[in-house]
UniProtKB/Swiss-Prot annotation:
Role: Myosins are actin-based motor molecules with ATPase activity. Unconventional myosins serve in intracellular movements. Their highly divergent tails are presumed to bind to membranous compartments, which would be moved relative to actin filaments. Involved in glucose transporter recycling in response to insulin by regulating movement of intracellular GLUT4-containing vesicles to the plasma membrane. Component of the hair cell's (the sensory cells of the inner ear) adaptation-motor complex.
Protein name: Unconventional myosin-Ic
Family classification: Belongs to the TRAFAC class myosin-kinesin ATPase superfamily. Myosin family.
Lineage of the organism: Eukaryota, Metazoa, Chordata, Craniata, Vertebrata
Main location: cytoplasm
Modified residues (N6-methyllysine): K364
Record organism: Rattus norvegicus (Rat)
Compartmental location: Cytoplasm; Nucleus; Cytoplasm, Cell cortex; Cell projection, Stereocilium membrane
Length: 1044
């Protein structure tokens, strides 16, 4: 398998183990071996704290991975993370569970040696989760087997089934494994998983009948009640409320917020189908689970002889159906004990206490044997189907050990004794294999092996397991001997047999001071991890694990197929006393040690940061306790007994070669020689390092840290140089690219311009020749020779005309057209003028239109006829010269509803004497009204207005002629207005007398009264003068403004 040289971090930066050394003050070191004060437990824990604070939950002790449970999802187990760690050297990436998984897998593939990953730690430290993550990694990253992914799916789906039947909520962990598990995963020669096998150890079956306050029974009971279908529960005789079952209420913790039993049951049901459970097998399995609940609800009452009698007939009825046994047989087995004496079978009745004991013993036996059957069933499902093929021999095995860690509680009993004995054996194996691995590496590298002083816990293992004199042997002997054996007699036997052992102590053997901390029913062992005090109460009973013979006989007759396999009839004919629980556990543990010894080990030590299961909380007391019991300091001390750091020459030279001028930038010789030159330049002292065959060994972390600090400084310098070189290169390349592009563009553009210029010259020459020929023949009829010229002349005229069109209707300019376009030019001129007029007319407002119409009428009447007309042209006509407020209300009242269209102040001349008088001239729709102050002096209807006379001079007099026959009128009216042109134009329009305005040259005759006429004489002079002449005429002298 090929290595990938590097890996990318989440930010895209290459991350290696050494790259984090520069941040060691903030996040700690990634390998405890690099701790300067490696013997200090405080320094060890402080390094853990720093990393935990930064969400770095993994740290190495050499090849051993220490994991701290974060109690929250850190999003570090995604497919992206798996790819990041797959195929990468162990020290090329930060510490991670996947790094260990990949290293183990690559060793399995390349070295063809069986591997084992040992996961240990106390409950709630994350062992089960680590096992699941390892299986997930192998399922996602390993190649798929040729026959599909069935085995891979079964490996993954075996977990939820085993968790349902073997895990429970405890005070320390909501999903605590209550059994030890060792799983072998078989891989073919291609590295694909093809099979598996599971071994289970020491299921905590006492939990079936008893739970401490705040704890639960095994998950499967609650999952079935919460998630089972109504029909299934009815068939099993169950109801959903867990409070209805004695075995589920003792912990008083049926509901847990962090556990969803309903959804978990769906996962379990799906998993059962994946691992080849038939519907009948599922039904039989659920019947057994339900029978345990019903068994817990069996109650007894004492008869007159104090013998126990079953009082819950309904529960007994369900039990007989679910377990497939006879009701009377089961009743008798629960209330009597069968004794065989001298070949005779005797039934001894049980009292209430003994009956309850028998009931609970049956419940524990049924559940524990069902669990063992379940493991065997899963193993059959995981077994490789190619075991008989020749390629089977090429398979390799990877073992996963999820075992309970060292346990020290307030009250420690038989279970803790077995668990801690197991940890002693594993610690013994761990130290042995670690020292062996260290020694083999030293020898392979040609480095002298320095003997390591360490605590050999063989003395404790012998104390527990030695034949005849060990605790287990003494316990078995006490269980087997005739007579009244009790837990206290067992303790006395221990005191007599091993009283001189330095690691054993009881109340009787202790000094006065120590006795205060030991009860008379306790003994204390000094384990490798510290002292543990055990209570002997229940040791004999739990070791015997006694199930009365008639209960076995009853279960052997079961028609439930699973029960029939769990209780084999051969047990009844076997007269040999069954092995005790402790002996069985010792034998299985010795077998496990041999299995692990045959494999290449890897270690994962799990630590729980606090008891409250809260993220971000670091309980130093609790962690110090676990560091001690996991033997991590001892592990570190063994690892650091020689050299703290070792790396291949190639990797060391590649990382640090920039620190030496001779090795930078390229070393062409052997890597070993390059490293020798490098360390001499760095000033390493002989006692600080050793040169092996393929690796350099550095004794002290401070030597490595000094080198790393120098590298960080050197990197800054190199980074500056690289940046400068890169910028120079980058801008040079950019300049050259721009230059090449510019030359290319210039070349192309010059060619284009040249071609355009040549084409233009050719076109110009042809055009000039055609124009000259056309000009010569311009007067000839149209022909091919002059057509281009004529068209050019016409086009030029039209284009020039477009630029020289008249600006307005008064502009009469127009370009001179060529002879051929004269007619067209006139038509265009007419169209242009019409268009300008039309546009102008569309643009004027109604008010302006009225103004123009009045001006047009004034022009028609006065233009060229009256001297002062030109002065009135630029002056706008006003709609009225008097406002409403200037006209008397009495006048307005006299006019009634008639609107005033125009009003102007005038001067009226009397008919006799020509005396001037101020008046107002009002025009209505039907009459001319002359007003004096508040009185209407004269009203002239338009029908009686026969004409209007005015002189041709610049004066402002005019005469309104009325019909002589009108009796209402006294005669014509002589008036003077400063706005004579405006007044006469509006009067003529209102009275429809445009054609009745007379412009006289010398005099005007008007009717002065009945039978009398008056005359107004007009003469020109230097200034305006109006007087009565001696001849009785009205003489008007007016200056001449325009010569006509």
């Amino acid at each position: 398998m090929r290595y990938r040289a590097s890996a990318l971090g989440s930010d895209g930066v290459r991350v290696t183990m050494e790259s984090a050394l520069t941040a060691r003050d903030r996040v700690g070191v990634q390998d405890f071996v690099l701790l300067e004060n490696f013997t200090s437990e405080a320094a060890f824990i402080e390094n853990l704290r720093r990393r935990f604070r930064e969400n770095l939950i993994y740290t190495y002790i050499g090849p051993v991975l220490v994991s701290v449970n974060p109690y929250r999802d850190l999003q570090i187990y995604t497919r992206q993370h798996m790819e990041r760690y797959r195929g990468v050297s162990f020290y090329e990436v930060p510490p991670h569970l996947f790094a260990v998984a990949d290293t183990v897998y690559r060793a399995l593939r390349t070295e063809r040696r069986d591997q084992a990953v040992m996961i240990s730690g106390e409950s709630g430290a994350g062992k089960t989760e680590a096992t699941k993550r390892l299986l997930q990694f192998y399922a996602e990253t390993c190649p798929a087997p040729e026959r599909g992914g069935a085995v891979r799916d079964r490996l993954l789906q075996s977990n939820p089934v085993l968790e349902a039947f073997g895990n429970a909520k405890t005070l320390r962990n909501d999903n605590s494994s209550r059994f030890g598990k060792y799983m072998d995963v078989q891989f073919d020669f291609k590295g694909a998983p093809v099979g598996g096998h599971i071994l289970s150890y020491l299921l905590e079956k006492s939990r079936v009948v008893h739970q401490n306050h705040g704890e639960r029974n095994f998950h499967v009971f609650y999952q079935l009640l919460e998630g089972g279908e109504e029909e299934a529960l009815r068939r099993l005789g169950l109801e959903r409320n867990p409070q209805s079952y004695l075995y589920l209420v003792k912990g008083q913790c049926a509901k847990v917020s962090s556990i969803n039993d309903k959804s978990d049951w769906k996962v379990v049901r799906k998993a059962l189908s994946v691992i080849d459970f038939t519907e009948d097998e599922v039904e039989d399995l659920l019947s057994i689970v339900a029978s345990v609940l019903h068994l817990g609800n069996i109650h007894f009452a004492a008869d007159e002889d104090s013998n126990a009698q079953v009082t819950t007939e309904n529960q007994l009825k369900y039990l007989t159906r679910l377990l497939g046994v006879e009701g009377t047989t089961l009743r008798e087995a629960l209330t009597h004990r069968k004794i065989i004496a001298k070949g005779e079978e005797l039934l001894s009745p049980l009292n209430l206490e003994q009956a309850a004991y028998a009931r609970d013993a049956l419940a524990k036996a049924v559940y524990s044997r069902t669990f063992t059957w379940l493991v065997r069933k899963i193993n059959r499902s995981l077994a490789s189907k190619d075991a008989e093929s020749p390629s089977w021999r090429s398979t390799t095995v990877l073992g996963l050990l999820d075992i309970y860690g060292f346990e020290v509680f307030q009250h420690n009993s038989f279970e803790q004794f077995c668990i801690n004995y197991c940890n002693e054996k594993l610690q013994q194996l761990f130290i042995e294999l670690t020292l062996k691995s260290e020694q083999e590496e030293y020898e392979a590298e040609g480095i002298a092996w320095e003997p390591v002083q360490y605590f050999n816990n063989k003395i404790i293992c012998d104390l527990v397991e030695e034949k005849f004199k060990g605790i287990i042997s003494i316990l078995d002997e006490e269980c087997l001997r005739p007579g009244e054996a009790t837990d206290l007699t067992f303790l006395e036997k221990l005191e007599d047999t091993i009283k001189h052992h330095p690691h054993f102590l009881t109340h009787k053997l202790a000094d006065q001071k120590t006795r205060k901390s030991l009860d008379r029913g306790e003994f204390r062992l000094l384990h490798y991890a510290g002292e543990v005090t055990y209570s002997v109460t229940g040791f004999l009973d739990k070791n015997n694990d006694l199930l009365f013979r008639n209960l076995k006989e009853t279960m052997c007759s079961s028609t439930n197929p699973i029960m029939a396999q769990c209780f084999d009839k051969s047990e009844l004919s076997d007269k040999k006393r069954p092995e005790t629980v402790a002996t069985q556990f010792k034998m299985s543990l010795l077998q496990l040690v041999e299995i692990l010894r045959s494999k290449e080990p890897a270690y994962i030590r799990c630590i729980k940061p606090n008891d409250a299961k809260q993220p971000g909380r670091f309980d130093e007391v609790l962690i110090r306790h676990q560091v001690k019991y996991l033997g991590l300091m001892e592990n570190l001390r063994v690892r650091r007994a020689g050299f703290a750091y070792r790396r291949k020459y190639e990797a060391f030279l590649q990382r640090y070669k920039s620190l030496c001028p001779e090795t930078w930038p390229v070393w062409t010789g052997r890597p070993q020689d390059g490293v020798a030159v490098l360390v001499r330049h760095l000033g390493y002292k002989p006692e600080e390092y050793k040169m092996g065959r393929t690796k350099i060994f550095i004794r002290f972390p401070k030597t490595l840290f000094a080198t790393e600090d120098s590298l960080e400084v050197r990197r800054q310098s190199l980074a500056t140089k690289i940046q400068a070189a890169w910028r120079g290169f980058h801008w040079r390349q950019k300049f050259l690219r721009v230059k090449r592009s510019a030359i290319c563009i210039q070349s192309w553009w010059r060619g284009t311009l040249g071609r355009r210029k040549a084409a233009k010259r050719k076109w110009a020459a042809q055009t000039i020749r055609r124009l000259i020929r056309g000009f010569i023949l311009r007067h000839a009829p149209r022909c091919p020779e002059n057509a281009f010229f004529l068209d050019h002349v016409r086009t030029s005229f039209l284009l020039n005309l477009r630029r020289q069109l008249p600006r307005n209707v008064l502009d009469t300019s127009w370009p001179t057209p060529p002879p051929a376009l004269r007619e067209a030019s006139e038509l265009l001129r007419e169209l242009c003028m019409k268009n300008m007029v039309w546009k102008y007319c569309r643009s004027i407002s109604p008010e302006w239109k009225q103004q123009l119409q009045q001006k047009a009428v004034a022009s028609e009447i006065f233009k060229g006829k009256k001297d002062n007309y030109p002065q009135s042209v630029p002056r706008l006509f006003i709609s009225t010269r008097l406002g409403t407020e200037e006209i008397s209300p009495r006048v307005l009242q006299a006019l009634g509803s008639e609107p005033i269209q125009y009003a102007v102040p005038v001067v009226k001349y009397d008919r006799k004497g020509y005396k001037p008088r101020s008046r107002q001239l009002l025009l209505t729709p039907s009459a001319v009204v002359i007003v004096e102050d508040a009185k209407v002096k004269q009203r002239i209807d338009y029908a009686n207005l026969t004409g209007i006379s005015v002189s041709s001079l610049s004066d402002s007099l005019f005469v309104l002629h009325v019909q002589r026959e009108d009796s209402k009128q006294k005669g014509d009216v002589v008036l003077q207005s400063d706005h004579v042109i405006e007044t006469l134009t509006k009067t003529a329009l209102s009275a429809d007398r445009v054609n009745n305005i007379n412009i006289n040259q010398g005099s005007i005759t008007f009717a002065g009264g009945p039978g009398r006429d008056g005359i107004i004489d007009f003469t020109s002079g230097s200034e305006l003068l109006i007087t009565k002449a001696k001849n009785g005429h009205l003489a008007v002298v007016a200056p001449r403004l325009n010569s006509r």
